[in-house]
Amino acid sequence: MTGDRPWHGQCSLQLISKTATDDLQSQLTVHQSQCTAPFKIQRANLDHDGRCQLPLLHTAGGLVGGDQLSVNVKAGADSRGLVTSVAAQKVYGSVGRSKQHPKGRWASQECHFELETNADLEWLPQELVVFQGGLYKQRMQVELQPKASFLCAEVVRLGRTAAGETLNEGAWRSSLEICRQTPIGRQWELVDQLELNSEVLQSLHGMGTQPVFGSFVWAAPHPLTADVMEILLRNCRTDRANLEGSMACGGLDQGLVARYIGPSSQAARQWFSRLWARTRQLRRLSTPQPPREWPLQEEGTFSNERFTKDHQSPSASPH
């Protein structure tokens, strides 16, 4: 927010696949971007497999009620991209209380992702912290063409527990919709709607007083066979070892979904990082390179040794 006016920041990204000039067999991804305050794109980095890593900076340092953010990403055919955030996002106590909005106004973010054939996009923002009384809602819409892959993960902390804060009248609301174009038309792959508030936080059937929630979703480029899915889920469950919290995962018709509930943002990040590496391994892609903006990961999270030691490692199409 600037003065008494809420922000309405917009960011548009386009990812384009091109042939490397020094190696006609090598593909790399470049980007075009257009942003308005408080968004700013930092310097892009290229992974060793030509994937474009884009750090997105929110210069305002946090959100308050009424702030709106819009992100639009179009990934061209055969492009590979990873979009992350430079730092954790903060949602402060809501403002603008009135008869119409007795708890204050919501801060919001709308994300739209459009992936062409064979595109591969990973949306991996850093942690979101909802302060006491903060109100935040987001909507993510994903449109996939055949053979496109979309992966996203998010970690949310409800209240600053280290400071003794609770959520009080704050809330976090999320909607994720993924659909894919097929020979018989558009098919829904996932519709996921969640709301976390103080009641859910305290409920034994909800968060059970645990302050951290995480969600991981992978829409795979191809259907996974029953055998491949069984081994993938077994490995993902094994990857929970030595991490605190409650973790569960399951298969989609064409992909993977996982949830974390617990006390530790770090544990959620570590488990999701391991799952991320599993999806890369399954497609015979390079081991993930954590963006340099991220906090240090646990030693060995992305080591080849962790994954090659499995007695059964499933493999699928490399695209």
From Swiss-Prot:
Q: Where in the cell is it found?
A: Cytoplasm
Disordered as annotated region, ranges: 284-319
The cross-references to InterPro entries, in alphabetical order and at most eight, read:
UreD (IPR002669)
One GO cellular component this record assigns the protein to is:
cytoplasm
Q: Which domain of life is it from?
A: Bacteria
The disulfide bridges present are none
The reply to whether Chaperone figures as a keyword in the UniProt entry is: yes
User: Which UniProt keywords are present, listed alphabetically?
Assistant: Chaperone, Cytoplasm, Nickel insertion
One GO MF annotation is: nickel cation binding
Q: What does the record give as the function of this protein? A: Required for maturation of urease via the functional incorporation of the urease nickel metallocenter.
Assembly state and interactors? UreD, UreF and UreG form a complex that acts as a GTP-hydrolysis-dependent molecular chaperone, activating the urease apoprotein by helping to assemble the nickel containing metallocenter of UreC. The UreE protein probably delivers the nickel.
Q: Which family does it belong to?
A: Belongs to the UreD family.
Full protein name? Urease accessory protein UreD
Q: In the UniProt record, what gene is named as encoding this protein?
A: ureD
